[in-house]
């Protein structure tokens, strides 16, 4: 009697048929469960693009849209490669398992030159395509154009933010403003450390000066300063190229607005440390309120180092800036253009802090 005939002669009590029947039932059941879970997950997405973005924000700048499209393209490429690889693994496991009657090794492909070439060249082609599109998007995101229409000074400190308008120059000529405050900047220059008890000159850490030298920081006439009582709101116009000049007054921070799909480290004295401290957005194409964070662990209250970007129309921005130049507080200027005077996107933190006495 052959082994197959012996197997068929086993009674049901030995479990031959139940095992096979169980496997036949479990496979379709597992497939149905997988498809059901996938359907539930995808049903919560408004489109395939949202599903493939895997939680990425939609973005409010042209650079953000390019970055999101690059991410979605990489996800699609990964899914295609994964489907092929896992499909082949499943196919080999399901249809080419060793049988009880097999006595020889299956056909080997160790010296199949065409197959080896395909398996070697294909990954390099995939990497090359992804590398090309990554470089293209990166160049557009890091591009610094001459004469941006709005220049914002961003100063990070433990554990809050200061925003100032260094320069505003709309190309249509409707608003020109120079907001730099050089006198306050000069006041940050420290004096040499002098001589020690032996009459020798003390050499400081910064060009022979003491470490309180902060001449790399920028100061402006119109500023919004965050504090324990105020979550700072940075007001920006739509449709204008905006430059952010970043500096830290103490430790390393990171300026991150998730809807920009971009973040950059904020470093003390960045130029002396050969670090890039400027980036631009081509324009912001969606008005609204957008939360911002520090994305670099910077100490005890790092998690509360939030801010808000409030995007308004160019006309509202001009009215807001005029209010600030007239001496109004940030909250009062926001109220004057019909905006909430306090942050509305910094949940779960108290968004009502910052309601200044004059606007309560």
Swiss-Prot record:
> Enzyme group, top EC level?
translocase
Instruction: Show the catalytic activity.
Output: 4 Fe(II)-[cytochrome c] + O2 + 8 H(+)(in) = 4 Fe(III)-[cytochrome c] + 2 H2O + 4 H(+)(out)
Q: Which residues bind Cu cation?
A: 253, 294, 298, 302
Q: Keywords assigned by UniProt?
A: Cell membrane, Copper, Electron transport, Membrane, Metal-binding, Respiratory chain, Signal, Translocase, Transmembrane, Transmembrane helix, Transport
Topology in the lipid bilayer is annotated as:
Multi-pass membrane protein
> Where does the signal sequence lie?
1-39
Localization (cell): Cell membrane
Q: What is its EC number?
A: 7.1.1.9
Output the Gene Ontology terms for molecular function.
Answer: copper ion binding; cytochrome-c oxidase activity
Q: Which Gene3D superfamilies match?
A: 1.10.287.90, Cupredoxins - blue copper proteins
Report whether Membrane shows up as a keyword of the record: yes
Cofactor: binding details: Binds a copper A center.
Provide a GO biological process annotation: ATP synthesis coupled electron transport
Functional description taken from the UniProt entry: Subunits I and II form the functional core of the enzyme complex. Electrons originating in cytochrome c are transferred via heme a and Cu(A) to the binuclear center formed by heme a3 and Cu(B).
Gene of origin? ctaC
Q: Species name for this entry?
A: Mycolicibacterium paratuberculosis (strain ATCC BAA-968 / K-10) (Mycobacterium paratuberculosis)
User: Superkingdom of this entry's organism?
Assistant: Bacteria
**Protein family according to the UniProt entry:** Belongs to the cytochrome c oxidase subunit 2 family.
Protein name as annotated: Probable cytochrome c oxidase subunit 2
Alphabetical GO CC annotations of the entry are: plasma membrane
Q: Report TM segments.
A: 70-90, 117-137
Cofactor(s) recorded in Swiss-Prot or TrEMBL:
Cu cation; heme
């Amino acid at each position: 009697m052959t082994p197959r005939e012996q197997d068929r002669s086993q009674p049901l009590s030995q479990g031959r048929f139940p095992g096979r029947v169980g496997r036949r039932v479990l496979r379709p059941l597992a497939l149905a469960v997988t498809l059901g879970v996938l359907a539930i997950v995808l049903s919560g997405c408004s489109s395939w693009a949202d599903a493939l973005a895997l939680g990425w924000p939609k973005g409010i700048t042209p650079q953000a849209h390019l970055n999101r499209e690059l991410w979605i393209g990489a996800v699609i490429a990964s899914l295609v490669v994964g489907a092929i690889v896992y499909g082949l693994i499943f196919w080999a496991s399901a249809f080419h398992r060793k049988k009880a009657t097999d006595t020889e090794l299956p056909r080997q492909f160790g010296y199949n030159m065409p197959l080896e070439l395909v398996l070697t060249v294909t990954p390099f082609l995939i990497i090359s395509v992804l590398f090309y599109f990554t470089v293209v998007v990166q160049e557009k995101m890091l591009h610094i154009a001459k004469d941006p229409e709005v220049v914002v000074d961003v100063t990070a400190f433990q554990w809050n933010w200061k925003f100032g308008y260094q320069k505003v120059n709309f190309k249509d000529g409707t608003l020109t403003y120079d907001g730099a405050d050089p006198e306050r900047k000069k006041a940050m220059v420290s004096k040499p450390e002098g001589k020690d008890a032996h009459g020798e000159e003390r050499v400081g850490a910064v060009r022979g000066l003491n470490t309180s030298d902060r001449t790399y920081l920028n100061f402006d006439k119109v500023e919004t300063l965050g504090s324990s009582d105020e979550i700072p709101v940075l007001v920006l116009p739509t449709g204008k190229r905006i430059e952010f000049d970043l500096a830290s007054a103490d430790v390393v921070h990171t300026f991150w607005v998730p809807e920009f799909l971009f973040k950059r480290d904020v470093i003390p004295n960045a130029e002396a440390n050969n670090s890039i401290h400027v980036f631009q957005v081509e324009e912001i194409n969606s008005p609204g309120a957008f939360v911002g964070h520090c994305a670099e662990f910077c100490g005890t209250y790092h998690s509360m180092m939030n801010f808000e970007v409030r995007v308004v129309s160019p006309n509202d921005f001009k009215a807001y800036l005029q209010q600030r130049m007239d001496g109004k507080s940030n909250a009062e200027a926001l109220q004057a253009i019909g905006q909430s005077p306090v942050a509305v996107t910094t949940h779960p933190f108290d968004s009502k802090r910052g309601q200044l006495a004059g606007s309560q």
